[in-house]
Design a protein with these regions (language model features):
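Soluble acyl-CoA-dependent acyltransferase catalytic core bearing the H(X)4D motif
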Residues: 1-283, 287-339
């Protein structure tokens, strides 16, 4: 299946896909509720008007809510200068980043794309690594991806000493109460991946530290506002902005938490779910991570002229993950047995 991003981001589309599937192989077929001819005739005519009215009511409600919040907590006004300064600092940090390092991942893009996906890795093992290392699931997976990209470059005889590349990572900004809403509601952060670090343990620690710093910064919210702003500007302005920020990174990386239970489609068991993140801003590589039913899969999409063999990256990811597990979890269990 192929969806346009205007329908929704990864979180929203995951919800849509989930609703199209069943949790049992023999789920009953739900028949659509019939509509009267009157509804059928007036629906398309009234829908734009109703949508406009609902949007106006929501905007008014938001404004009233914000006004009441300031009346209840006037001290929040004192925080506005600090918040503005923090946002400006986050934006200037990205704008002042030097152009991305020249690697085989960057270059002139063509039309043809290549895709690959890894064998699933157990989510429980990812969590075990994180528990021992004091890291999040996302930190563990990103560290394994960094190791895989490092291994790929070494395989192409590219010098990786001291090398770092940046990844643009979408961050879901929906509150839990609106987790099932359609639309795009994400910000962006720029993460530097330490490809020049040979030790997988040190690499994980560095990724963890950098992700924690990004979570404390307003960068994701700042870029959410920028995405909305540039989306309303002329196409030429929007394209220049996208290219500017695209020059600061090598890849788009996203992690979507999928369904935790076994799903079925038309009575057939779904063994795995995978997607490939769309690329923009002249970025030649997209890396997507999807969890489903206790397993995690890595997907890679690349420009065929730059990386014609993305399966080498997915294979390296599997290897790097097992190295992390053996070095961190197995070693920890060995130390416990010895004591």
């Amino acid at each position: 299946m192929r969806f346009h991003h205007c329908i929704g981001d990864g979180t929203a589309m995951n919800t849509v896909m989930h609703r199209l599937m069943d949790t049992t192989p023999d789920a009953p077929i739900e028949r659509p509720t019939p509509h009267s001819n009157h509804d059928h005739t007036l629906g398309p005519l009234l829908e734009p008007l109703v949508s406009t009215i609902e949007g106006t009511i929501k905007l008014a409600d938001d404004l009233v809510h914000e006004g009441m919040e300031f009346l209840r907590h006037p001290e929040h006004l004192l925080n506005l200068p600090a918040q503005a300064a923090s946002g400006a600092l986050a934006l200037s940090r990205v704008l002042l980043l030097p152009p991305e390092a020249k690697t085989p991942f960057k270059g002139q893009l063509g039309v043809q794309k290549c895709v690959a996906w890894s064998a699933p890795v157990p989510l429980d093992q990812v969590k075990q690594i994180g528990k021992v290392a004091g890291a999040k699931v996302n930190d563990v997976l990103l560290a394994a991806v960094a190791g895989a990209l490092r291994a790929y470059l070494i395989g192409r005889d590219f010098k990786v000493d001291g090398l770092e590349i940046r990844a643009v990572i979408p961050v879901d900004l929906r509150p839990p109460s609106r987790a099932h809403d359609l639309g795009n509601e994400f910000g962006l952060v720029f993460l530097s991946l330490p490809l020049g670090t040979p030790s997988p343990v040190v690499r994980l620690a560095e990724v963890k530290q950098r992700m924690e710093a990004l979570k404390r910064s307003p960068e994701a919210h700042v870029f959410y506002g920028l995405l909305n702003f540039f989306g309303r500007t002329p196409a030429q302005v929007e394209e220049q902005a996208v290219n500017l920020f695209g020059s600061k990174a090598t890849a788009v990386m996203t992690n979507v938490r999928g369904p935790t239970e076994q799903l079925y489609l038309a009575g057939n068991r779904i063994r795995n779910i995978m997607f490939w993140v769309p690329q923009s801003g002249r970025l030649g590589m997209g890396i997507s991570i999807m969890s489903y039913c206790g397993q995690v899969t890595l997907g890679v999409i690349t420009d065929a002229g730059l990386v014609p063999d993305p399966q080498k990256i997915t294979t390296a990811f599997e290897r790097e993950f097992h190295v992390l597990y053996d070095v961190i979890v197995a070693k920890e269990h060995g130390n416990e047995s010895a004591s």
